[in-house]
Amino acid sequence: MTSKISTTYEEEGRQSKIQPRAFVITRSGPSSKSSSFSARQSYASSRQSITPGVYQQLSSSGITDFRGTREKEKREMQNLNERLASYIEKVHFLDAQVKKLEAENEALRNRKSESLQPIRDAYENELAQARKVIDELSSTKGVSEAKVAGLQDEIASLRELIVTYENQSKDYRKKIESLGNQIGEYEGELHTLRIRCGSLEDENAKVRELLDKIQEQNRRLRADLDTETAAHIEADCLAQTKTEEAEFYKDLLDQLELLKPEPIQIKGMDYAEFWKSELSKCVREIQSAYDEKIDMIQQDTEAKYSAQLNSLRSGNVKDGMQLQHVQEEVKKLRTQAGEKNAMYAELAAKFASLQAERDSIGRQCSELERELEELRIKYNQDIGDLSNELSAVLAQLQILTDAKITMELEIACYRKLLEGEESRVGLRSLVEQAIGVQGRGTASLKDTIQQSTSSGSMTIQRSSKGPIAFNSVDQSGSNIVIENTTSGARAKTQSLRGWRIDKTVAGRVAASIQLKDYEIPPNTKYTIWAKGAKDRATADNEQIADIFSLGVGSCTWTIVDEAGNEKATLIAKFSG
């Protein structure tokens, strides 16, 4: 209260009209026999109000009530006296304070004003240095923007090159797929030909088995024919032998005719005639028996030989026809087998060439894929490095922009302070800051810097897809305010569990603030403070972000729920 009165007197420059007063206060305890002035006055008035004869009318109970009333009145008077004494003490204290303040005010009025030229020069030097820093930051910003533009162009060219390589890779994959399909068709045709060749080989094996059977049968027939021929030759030899034997006997008979002796007469018998007749008889018997035997053998042999020859002739004709047919079939099958073998060899050569071409294309594709993967890894690394460099440049640019805005705010603040140097409070703050005294001027300067605005303007566009929406964003980057816009019958509480707020600058997320688990009631605001603006939260609907400053300048703020859906958006565009 004293400081308020002093400030009012200093600002208005008028003297106090309250004059010193003298009071004499006499206090007495409750048990004292002598009372204060007020007590005596009350007692006197009470005593004067009693008329004669009243005491006779009072009973013992009336006297007791009267005494209680008197004690009560005494206590009330004592309380009033104490309150009056405390009030008088306060008045004395305030009068003394007013005198002191009047003396200080008079001393300040009589005090000669000091020269502010050193302070003005110091602030002008600081302003010149600030302008120089701003110019340097502007040039650095231009270089950084040019570098960022070059990096973006390079990233765009690298992306186009990656797209070209990906298109080439797709073309190679399509070509490989078509070649694989063609190879599959060739393999299917080759498999069909192999099956057909296998069936032809099976038929050829069956024909060979049939030919082997026919040849075996021919061999058996030849063996039988050889046997019959040998028997026929043996019979011919036997007949020749018998013929020679007959010739021998005939010659022998002829010789006997030549060596015929003279007839011998025995007892009147002619032995020559006897011998001749007997011998002729024997020869005729032998000859007849031999002829019969020869005829029988010859007939049997001729019949058997004729039958065998007939069977051989018929079998040879049949076998010859079958053999000729089989030979023709074998020749035809050999021709077909030769053609199939040639076709198979041609297909095998073609398949080998296609397989070699496929392997070559596969190796080329593997090499191209490896090169493409290396290029992709390299380009991804380059993109990552460029992105990191771009992020660093953007962060540095954001820092420079924040520093520029801060310098602009400080310059505006200093300009206002210099323009308002007639204000005694402003002069006192500047003097205290110049001589290194930490007082009310420093806090006032700090508050003025934080609450001042730059010479630019900020355009804000808001949009929301639910009950939660942006309410405001502080231009100095100290806080963000969101609110639950529901009310009335549609009012509902919204939980912020898993929600976050993202700040996007130049298409990249520059900062992300994770909201705490809090339920916003309807028509209630929720404030997120920067760490540099507020140390700790003073209410449940406040949160301190783990960021020193939320930043200034053009940016986009987005509220994202736990599922990654955008619930509200605020676009801030700063111009100035």
Swiss-Prot record:
Coil 1A, as annotated region: 76-108
GO function terms (MF aspect): structural constituent of cytoskeleton
BP GO terms, sorted: heterochromatin formation; nuclear envelope organization; nuclear migration; nuclear pore localization; protein localization to nuclear envelope
Residue ranges of the region described as Disordered: 1-51
Primary localization class, coarse: cytoplasm
Signal peptide: none
InterPro entries: IF_conserved (IPR018039), IF_rod_dom (IPR039008), Intermed_filament_ifa/ifb (IPR016451), Lamin_tail_dom (IPR001322), Lamin_tail_dom_sf (IPR036415)
SUPFAM superfamilies hit by this protein: Intermediate filament protein, coiled coil region (SSF64593), Lamin A/C globular tail domain (SSF74853)
A GO-annotated cellular component: cytoplasm
Region listing for Coil 2, in residue ranges: 279-425
UniProt keyword Coiled coil, yes or no: yes
Name of the featured protein: Non-neuronal cytoplasmic intermediate filament protein
